Regions:
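Catalytic-core regions of core metabolic enzymes
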Residues: 1-297
Length: 297
């Protein structure tokens, strides 16, 4: 099994005809994803050939869902239009909304988050992102930009704030493989949290152990630690990026900033280790520990 995404997922791409959208749609097709179309109101009724497939372009998410039965949408639209694209997909009742776009205004994401949490979300849409690499269930489907050749299917569940650390961890543990790897994004507000992914991996019978990657800024890792204590029985190994980050300086992601004693890597490490999660110093050490755990299960 897997979480959120599998071989039966039917994917549309909002912004499929743009430069990044067309490039990554091609790569998703090559990964085995069931891409059933795209959305661009100005090009409705046309089609584009990507990855050897002739993909229809629809005028709206609602039309695309009616015609194709799509249940996943991947968003590749400019930051200024991302909020509207998300709300359109939510109104249409899409099951999973994967927002790749970086640079979305925090206020816009907050409004989308509130919309997701409100009565308008009748379809109970789950959003991943924004500013994320998306989600991959190796050997089955990719909704996002994660290189699908890094690792195959296996027993590890991976949840990470960082895209590049997602890729590195998958490479480090390619000998074991992954049930699902999900990059939740590094912005201050995201649709799916560490806790959401931990709960899903705990419920997934094919996930035997979990790698959780965090970074400086906010308190998501501390809240995840509190959740792990009472709810997660599977082994969890952690890595927190940013032990040497200077105070007050944003480090790559909009949410990766230390203010005083708040959001430090040390505080996150302490919280996680207090509930039995071993937090390693490097990605390689994290992979080595996970490998040891799996060999002893």
């Amino acid at each position: 099994m897997s979480i959120y995404l599998n071989k039966d997922s039917r994917i549309i791409v909002q912004g499929m005809t743009g430069g990044m959208g067309s490039k990554h749609t091609t790569l998703m097709v090559q990964a085995g994803s069931n891409i059933v179309g795209g959305v661009n109101a100005r090009k409705a009724g046309t089609s584009v050939e990507l990855g050897g497939q002739d993909l229809p372009v629809f005028g709206s998410v609602e039309d695309a869902m009616k015609e194709t039965g799509a249940d996943v949408s991947v968003v590749f639209v400019p930051p200024a239009f991302t909020k509207d694209a998300c709300i359109e997909a939510i109104d249409a009742g899409i099951g999973l909304l994967v927002v790749i776009t970086e640079g979305v205004p925090v206020q816009d994401t907050a409004e989308v988050w509130a919309y997701l949490d409100g009565p308008a979300n009748v379809g109970q849409t789950r959003m991943i992102g924004p500013n994320c690499p998306g989600i991959i269930t190796p050997g089955e489907s990719l909704a996002g930009i994660t290189p699908h050749t890094i690792a195959g299917k296996g027993p590890i569940g991976l949840v990470s704030k960082s895209g590049t650390l997602t890729y590195q961890m998958m490479y480090e543990l390619k000998d074991f493989g992954f049930s699902t790897a999900i990059g939740i994004g590094g912005d201050p507000i995201v649709g799916t949290t560490h806790i959401d992914a931990l709960a899903a991996f705990e419920a997934d019978p094919d996930t035997k152990a979990i790698v959780m990657i965090g970074e400086i800024g906010g308190d998501a890792e501390e809240r995840a630690a509190a959740y792990i204590k009472g709810n997660v029985t599977k082994p969890v190994v952690g890595y927190v990026a940013g032990f040497t980050a200077p105070e007050g300086k944003t480090m790559g992601h909009a949410g990766a900033i230390v203010s005083g004693s708040s959001g430090t890597a040390a505080a996150k490490k302490e919280a996680l280790e207090a509930v039995g999660v071993k937090v390693c110093k490097t990605p390689s050490e994290t992979a080595s520990l996970m490998r040891e755990i799996l060999q002893n299960l």
